[in-house]
Amino acid sequence: MTVLTEKWADVLDLEGAPKIVDAHRRAVTAQLIENQVKAMKEDYAHGQFFTMLQEDAPVNHGGDGVAMGQAGTNAQMAGYDPVLINLVRRAMPQLIAFDVCGVQPMTMPTGLIFALRARYGKQDGQEALYNEADTGFGGDGFGQLGATHKGSNWADGGEYEVGSGMSTMDAETLGAGKDWGEMAMSIERTSVTAQTRALKAEYTMELAQDLKAVHGLDAENELSNILATEILSEINREIIRNIYITAEVGCESGTMEKGVFDLDVDADGRWSAEKYKGLLMRIEREANRIAQKTRRGRGNFIICSSDVASALQMAGMLDYAPALQNNLNVNEAQTTFAGILNGKYKVFVDPYQANGSANQYVVVGYKGSSAYDAGMFYCPYVPLQLVRAQDPNTFQPKIGFKTRYGIAFNPMVQVMAGVGTGSIKAKDIAGKNYYFRKFVIKNL
């Protein structure tokens, strides 16, 4: 348990809120609550908030939350805003970012993501420890790539040779007669800068009074929930769409058309269920391709339309209630998590794409167990900032929400795509992020 998770244990284990089981998700949520409180302290210190429309607290009371300062000192403003803390606690752990990309909270408005690359020769040489090792580089005494190691796939035919170690006589003349194989390393970095989303809402005091009297609802709380939900939904969609745009096109071979898997042409079966199993084999091939290109691991999650998820279920492969996983994070409100495919893929349904269409789709992606092992990173800074104000002419209340976060891509992906290591948009590496692969499904 980290210092922050221990500090905010009462909030993280809030009764009635979805339980946070994953240790990383707890740590990130704790850091975001800490960032939230820090931002609130600064806002209160600079007088950016008007009175919080709540009853006066007793003199020795530190507010509804944990006191920002000493109890009894400006008691009404000393407590953390329970609306914001509750929204952060309930909403942030539900973001799909935790399952499909790395989540690295920022403590400052700018940050850097680093990647170390091994090189053959000098720092600008060809990358090592990525594809197959050159069997002759350290053993033939030439100090060059491809001198004795040739060919990449023996099944394709053509020249295919292997390098070997050098003799004792040659080893004794290294540096004079024979050349040492030299290696180096370079450190790549990608910058990430916090960006902002902002929404506002206005209401009248008469509306607030009537809503309270008739329905027992607080107008400010209801509008706050609407604004916060919209902001977080927009972030979810931004993450999903970034994956769609940057994912590599799959179905490179074994299909009539690149990027398309036609169940009538590319799958053989007497019944639909047999063809659906052919679709599963295609998903397996795309996951294997991700492993070959990233050298990190096979694809382990899928984003698809609801029709594709139904097809996989009908094939008997999609388990909605895995016997060994009793704490699945199923967000029924957004209907995104569908289940576990073949015991190893998390399946997420995109409810807004391709439903009822003739062409369906699948995106296969990889996210490692570490927050640093992913093709894309979501970097929250200040989860939610609530601003209260009053119209100077009508004196009617207004509220505004802001959130600050950054989106960054794996620096290795950017370097391989040839776009540099600065802050980029998804369109700059469209179809080049090899941590994700996408293909269209026809005749489902």
Q: How should each PLM-predicted stretch be described?
A:
Residues R90-P93, V103-M106, G111-A194:
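Assembly/oligomerization interface modules of large self-assembling protein complexes
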Residues E6, L14, E34, E55, ...:
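Generic detector of low-complexity/intrinsically disordered segments
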Residues G250-E274:
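Acidic/histidine-rich catalytic neighborhood
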Residues D81-P82, R89-A91, A97-D99, E161-G165, ...:
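Sequence/fold signature of self-assembling virion shell proteins
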Residues I239-A247, C251, P411:
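Structured alpha-helical bundle/scaffold domains in large eukaryotic membrane-trafficking regulators
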Residues M1-G138:
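Extended assembly-interface regions of large multimeric machines
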